[in-house]
Every structure is written in structure tokens, then in C-alpha cells.
Amino acid sequence: MVRELIAILRGVAPHEVVAIAEELILAGITKIEVPLNSPKAYKSIENLANRFSGEAIIGAGTVLKKNEVASVCNAGGKMIVSP
């Protein structure tokens, strides 16, 4: 069952995101956001995109600048959330 939620991995380090995302995906949560004000956010997005391509939609939140959109895309992100 896919749940219509977006999980926000705020403040989570890149080495922690894959294990957390595995549990979220098992629970049916397949949209995962990494806020850009998290530690090494682009690395987290890259780790998630590499591991879960085709299984989940990975993206970034707290996107404030146009150049950040390109950086998220370069890291493999497919979703942008802006305040």
C-alpha cells in the first residue's frame, strides 16, 4: 500500500538516510524529502537517489534559490519543495 505522505528527513546525516528510507518504503511511504538545511543534504539526496531509483521519489525541501534546483537535480532529486 502506498501512502500519500511525504517523509521529511530533517537533520539526518548522509550515512543514516538509506536505513531510514528502507523502513519508510516498507511502510508504503515512497516520497522522501531532504531539507537543504540538513547536514550534507546533497550527499543524502545522492545516496537515496542511487539506492531507491524507481522505488521512491526523492527530493529536497527548503529550496530557496534557483541554483539549488539544479544542484538537487544533479544529485538525483526528482522533487522540489519550497516555502
Regions found by a protein language model. Give the residues of each.
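Ordered, amphipathic secondary-structure segments that act as subunit-interaction surfaces
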Residues: S82-P83
